[in-house]
């Protein structure tokens, strides 16, 4: 839903295992899904020798090596930071993702003049890792520390119907989706004056 491009700056201040920033990097760099994986079908006799290698070469030729994409991932949990680094390395995008341990309260993006940032995050829901009251407090904190800027759009995934009230701002747009079996919404905040998406 967020328009991630080769020149995007993507932020996830609650990165967990790094899924969002890694997927954003793969999209921005036009890296084909599974390009680094080995598939069981590669050993099937019905495929000609070299077919998988040929497809990989074709996909590799499509990678955007000229892209200036960068992602900035952080999490308060040191294990999440470790996992994000490890997963980014496995995906081949570690050089494009800056990872650090940080509290959401300290979120302060530095966006160079003329560029636009996109914050995409999936904060805790208060179902598995935290109590509902702790998850609500995180949403309230996000509303306080996420600046309203023309050069930064927000895409926040939440299952809570009252998210906008807790966050303190009404979304410009909302989109229903399922995160596994959990019914959620993506709350989108961007410069509504010009109708632009970051």
Question: At which residue positions do the language-model features occur?
Answer:
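Conserved S-adenosyl-L-methionine
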Residues: 1-108, 127-128, 134
